[in-house]
Amino acid sequence: MLDTGGGLKKAAWFFQDSRGHSGKETPFILHNVDVLSTIDLERMRQLHFETQALATLAVQDRETSRYLLFDERRQLCGRRAGRNQPPELVRPAQQARAWAFSGIHVISPRLLAMMTEDGVFSIIASYLRLAAQGEKILAFRADEYDWRDLGKPENVAQAVQDLK
């Protein structure tokens, strides 16, 4: 297991020729396999295109063990281990908002060449490093959508019950 960052970097060859018919770079969706959601991927992709972000991350205002921090322009500026833990800022923010990452990203292929990490690594490490360098890693607010973590058997069983 290479974690999300290591796995994506290993598959980078697949995205090397990412130019569409228009000759413009074609972003792709990266979606954690253990997530079930109704998040509008087309709206998310459209926001990504409109803002020319390097990456756009689906986030929600919900309880989690780790939070990503975003500034007033919805740009990634840090992370926090828990809601009551001190923030770890990688760039200044007047007011950092803590949102839970949903494991769904829209990524511009140019990100792949910027990933300097090797081996097993979280893509969040790349995002934080790139945000510190001024790259645009944006939040897509997805509070109005359903989202479930299916990483535990009991969560899968509950989702099956709810979908009946």
What residue spans do the PLM features occupy?
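Catalytic-core segments of class I nucleotidyltransferases/pyrophosphorylases
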Residues: H21, E25-I29, L36-S37, L41-F49, ...
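A short, conserved acidic/glycine-rich loop-to-beta-strand motif
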Residues: T51-D61
